[in-house]
């Protein structure tokens, strides 16, 4: 009798999954919060696309453009529930993500190329350039703190936006790893007018940042005024030492 109940329950579960898979994508888009705007969706909840998607960040809209998605129902248990691909002009984002039963957010195999200008919607940083990120793994705890982060971020054609005109900085790479001491990263200069070397660390909610700045851009008056509250002068340029909690 127990085997019969098991097969009945399994059949019911499979039927529910198949029924869900056939639901149109428009059903899913109607369940999204107001901070996500979707137009012209097609396909199914299981695998579909939207002609244009934008999300609200700090009261401003960030365009994702065309978005395609594919659900992985068996990946829900391990935090790999969906693959998302978006394209908006030269901007593209490919990512696999999910939420574990414990509430941890997991991101893997993320490839991102975008104009870094969107950072200004989150932080008061007047910067420009192109951001390329290859994130192997990112885990964010249920409390919202990063627990694991591995990957590489490249900031190309970096510039500081000043009233008198942009200050060209260069191209920089950040290599990020995670071990028992927490998340750590190293910043290196590939080329440019600002020589930047540094490192950062994050464990729990405690962070530290240390960096040295030198080169022609470090002698630019507008740039010096911009970093005056963060950096102290040295013989070769400037030094930044920050620490605190998120």
Where are these regions (language model features)?
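Membrane-embedded beta-strand positions in outer-membrane beta-barrel channels/transporters
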Residues: 94, 130-132, 137, 173, ...
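Short beta-strand or tight-loop elements
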Residues: 34, 46, 194
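Flexible, membrane-facing loop/turn or short amphipathic-helix motifs
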Residues: 52-63, 90-97, 112-125, 137-145, ...
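Outer-membrane beta-barrel architecture
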Residues: 146-150, 208
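Aromatic-capped interface at the extracytoplasmic side
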Residues: 15-40
């Amino acid at each position: 009798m127990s085997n019969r109940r098991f097969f009945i329950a399994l059949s019911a579960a499979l039927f529910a999954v198949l029924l869900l898979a056939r639901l149109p994508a428009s059903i899913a888009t109607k369940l999204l919060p107001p901070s996500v705007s979707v137009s012209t969706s097609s396909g199914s909840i299981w695998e579909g696309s939207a002609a244009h998607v934008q999300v609200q960040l700090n009261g401003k809209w960030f365009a994702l453009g065309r978005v395609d998605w594919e659900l992985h129902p068996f990946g829900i248990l391990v935090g790999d529930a969906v693959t998302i691909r978006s394209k908006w002009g030269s901007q593209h984002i490919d990512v696999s993500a999910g939420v574990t039963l414990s509430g941890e957010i997991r991101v893997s195999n993320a490839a991102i190329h975008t104009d870094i200008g969107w950072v200004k919607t989150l932080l008061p940083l007047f910067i420009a350039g192109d951001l390329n990120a290859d994130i192997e793994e990112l885990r964010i705890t249920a409390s919202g703190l990063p627990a694991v982060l591995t990957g590489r971020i490249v900031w190309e054609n970096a510039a500081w936006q000043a009233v008198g005109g942009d200050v060209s900085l260069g191209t920089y790479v950040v290599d990020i790893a995670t071990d028992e001491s927490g998340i750590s990263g190293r910043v290196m200069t590939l080329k440019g007018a600002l020589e930047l070397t540094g490192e950062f660390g994050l464990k729990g909610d405690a962070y530290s940042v240390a960096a040295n700045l030198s080169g022609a851009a470090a002698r630019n008056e507008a740039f010096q005024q911009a970093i005056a509250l963060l950096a102290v002068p040295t013989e070769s340029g400037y030094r930044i030492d920050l620490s605190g909690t998120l």
